[in-house]
């Protein structure tokens, strides 16, 4: 670049910083915040699948899945982990269904948890925006997008049609929220439900509620599914769960994690430690016996899990070794984040192009009908 152009650029950058504040424009290579702060999901396998050791602060996250798949349980686990780090969390309960006893059983400090049970979707998202703008709240959870009912729908008659009202509400709210989320470094988690698209012959008929805006604005999207029942004898004591990282702008996407959710207790951390320890040769398995550092820790998985519960120091040591082995180093992670963001931008551009083509096709069909 010539000296004159460099001087003009420096002058423009200086003017932008004076007018809009320091950090309003910078060179991407100078930005060291790509090594993003994160909070654990409560599942070691999922933390590893996410690539940065958990869910990222300063981003929008969407967790979706069928009913009773563990969506709210996972967000409560995130709150419990964040509170251990001294973070402030808020729960916007649009479904009016949060159980404080269950939350406490999962390790949530209910005395410190902020909770709101709004009457309308507009109120819920306005509360969410105010909490984010305060800069004093680290995690805001909205449960769920499907329950964010627009005011016009609540005040209207039961049979009234309100086409696209919720999608417009979400689109407007996310436009307001995203810049504030980045500035305040707040994580905003939206829980979402699944619906079926009518008349889909090929491809996946499933979709999430609230339109397409959340899909584009989310840095991380998690698809959580119940894959089976966990039994002790004839009694069902929990779920086998699979989580797929459908979208990830901070690390490579499409990784999966499998873990167990125990009723009344949450994610089985000890079960994951044993499974991952065996997989990566840190825990030895000979027949039914499990050994760690040459010492037998139990016969059968259930007894080995109990041993780790009774010996938290050994469990923490094993977890530390697994995290050190499987989580990428900061320099590598910075490169991965850039690559992941480029890939996510391409995917978003493809999705937008498809949506534009569909709209254009529908418009042409309408024109043909009107001409005929």
From Swiss-Prot:
SUPFAM superfamilies: P-loop containing nucleoside triphosphate hydrolases, RecA protein, C-terminal domain. Its main location: cytoplasm. GO terms for molecular function: ATP binding; ATP hydrolysis activity; ATP-dependent DNA damage sensor activity; damaged DNA binding; single-stranded DNA binding. Keywords: ATP-binding, Cytoplasm, DNA damage, DNA recombination, DNA repair, DNA-binding, Nucleotide-binding, SOS response. Gene3D superfamilies: P-loop containing nucleotide triphosphate hydrolases (3.40.50.300). It is found in: Cytoplasm. InterPro entries: AAA+_ATPase, DNA_recomb/repair_RecA, DNA_recomb/repair_RecA_CS, P-loop_NTPase, RecA-like_C, RecA-like_N, RecA_ATP-bd, RecA_C_sf. CDD domains: RecA. It comes from the Bacteria. GO terms for cellular component: cytosol. Residues 329-372 are annotated as: Disordered. ATP binds at residues 65-72. GO terms for biological process: DNA recombination; DNA repair; SOS response. Belongs to the RecA family. NCBIfam families: tigrfam_recA (TIGR02012). Can catalyze the hydrolysis of ATP in the presence of single-stranded DNA, the ATP-dependent uptake of single-stranded DNA by duplex DNA, and the ATP-dependent hybridization of homologous single-stranded DNAs. It interacts with LexA causing its activation and leading to its autocatalytic cleavage. PANTHER family: MITOCHONDRIAL DNA REPAIR PROTEIN RECA HOMOLOG-RELATED, RECA. This is Protein RecA.
């Amino acid at each position: 670049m010539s000296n004159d152009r460099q001087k003009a650029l420096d002058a423009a950058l200086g003017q932008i910083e004076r007018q809009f504040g320091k950090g309003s424009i910078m060179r991407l290579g100078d930005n060291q915040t790509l090594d993003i702060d994160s909070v654990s999901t409560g599942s070691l396998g999922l933390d590893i699948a996410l690539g940065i050791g958990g869910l990222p602060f300063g981003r929008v996250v969407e967790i979706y899945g069928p009913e009773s798949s563990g969506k709210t349980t996972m967000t409560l686990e995130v709150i419990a982990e964040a509170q251990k780090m001294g973070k402030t969390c808020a729960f916007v309960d649009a479904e009016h269904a949060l159980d404080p006893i269950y939350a406490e059983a999962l390790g949530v400090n209910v005395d410190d948890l902020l909770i709101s049970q709004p009457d309308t979707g507009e109120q819920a998202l306005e509360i969410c925006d105010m909490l984010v703008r305060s800069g004093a709240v680290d995690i805001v959870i909205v449960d769920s997008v499907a329950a964010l009912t627009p005011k016009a729908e609540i005040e209207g008659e039961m049979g009234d049609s309100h086409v696209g009202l919720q999608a417009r509400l979400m689109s407007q709210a996310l436009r307001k929220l995203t810049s504030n989320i980045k500035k305040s470094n707040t994580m905003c988690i939206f829980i979402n439900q699944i619906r079926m698209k009518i008349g889909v012959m090929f491809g996946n008929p499933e979709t999430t509620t609230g339109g397409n805006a959340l899909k584009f604005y989310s840095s991380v999207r998690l698809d959580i599914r119940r894959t089976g029942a966990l039994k002790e004898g004839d009694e069902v004591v929990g779920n086998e769960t699979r989580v797929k990282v459908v979208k990830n702008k901070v690390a490579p996407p499409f990784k999966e994690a499998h873990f167990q959710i125990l009723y009344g207790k949450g994610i089985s951390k000890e079960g994951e430690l044993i499974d991952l320890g065996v997989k990566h040769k840190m825990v030895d398995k000979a027949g039914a016996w499990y050994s760690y550092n040459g010492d037998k820790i139990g016969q059968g998985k259930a007894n080995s899990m109990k041993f780790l519960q009774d010996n938290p120091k050994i469990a923490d040591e094993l977890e530390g070794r697994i995290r050190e082995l499987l989580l990428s180093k900061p320099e590598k992670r910075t490169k991965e984040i850039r690559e992941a963001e480029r890939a996510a931008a391409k995917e978003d551009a493809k999705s937008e192009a498809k949506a534009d083509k569909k709209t254009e096709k529908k418009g042409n069909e309408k024109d043909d009908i009107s001409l005929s």
